[in-house]
From Swiss-Prot:
Protein name (Swiss-Prot/TrEMBL): Non-specific lipid-transfer protein
Source organism of the structure: Broussonetia papyrifera (Paper mulberry)
Biological role: Plant non-specific lipid-transfer proteins transfer phospholipids as well as galactolipids across membranes. May play a role in wax or cutin deposition in the cell walls of expanding epidermal cells and certain secretory tissues.
UniProt key word Transport: yes
Domain of life: Eukaryota
Family as reported in the entry's similarity comment: Belongs to the plant LTP family.
Tissues where this protein is expressed: Expressed in pollen.
Keyword Metal-binding part of the UniProt annotation: no
Swiss-Prot/TrEMBL keywords: Allergen, Lipid-binding, Transport
Amino acid sequence: DSCSNIIQPLTPCLNYVRALGQFSDIDIQTIPEQCGISATLPPID
C-alpha cells in the first residue's frame, strides 16, 4: 500500500486526535504540522 508509509507515522497522532474527539473539526492537511511531522498529504476526496 503506497499510502502506508504516509499513514503509519501519523497513526499515534491520529489516535491522539481521535481520543480528543475532535477529528472531524481538524483540517486533515494540518495534521502533519500539528504533529511535528514534515509531510504533505494528498487531497482526500
